Amino acid sequence: MYALLEIRGKQYKVKENSTILVPGWEEIKPEEVKVLMVKDEANTVVGTPFVEGAEIELEPVKQIRTKKIKVRRFKAKVNYHRKKSHRIRYTILRINGIKTSVLTEG
């Protein structure tokens, strides 16, 4: 069984016991997770736009930061130099379960 999710404007294809990388360190509320489609061996449910009665159990595993990205600016002949850097923050989520109340013939 797998599902298509939308979390913070990005879509993910997930299976049970898999992990996904979601931008940001803020806690993900259940209303932020929108289920777009659920499919098992024989049946498929496609939402219009979301599947009613579908729930995904998420567990935050770890919060990480990417490798540092460095940005440099330079203007010739005027002694202008700027250096900035940042690291993107991500949360690793584990999918513990996919639950849906209705599966229709597809």
UniProtKB/Swiss-Prot annotation:
Part of the 50S ribosomal subunit. Contacts protein L20. GO terms for molecular function: rRNA binding; structural constituent of ribosome. SUPFAM superfamilies: L21p-like. The gene is rplU. Belongs to the bacterial ribosomal protein bL21 family. This is Large ribosomal subunit protein bL21. GO terms for biological process: translation. InterPro entries: bL21-like (IPR028909), bL21-like_sf (IPR036164), Ribosomal_bL21 (IPR001787). Coiled coil: none annotated. Keywords: Ribonucleoprotein, Ribosomal protein, RNA-binding, rRNA-binding. This protein binds to 23S rRNA in the presence of protein L20. It comes from the Bacteria. Transmembrane segments: none annotated. One of its GO terms (cellular component) is ribonucleoprotein complex. Pfam families: Ribosomal_L21p (PF00829).
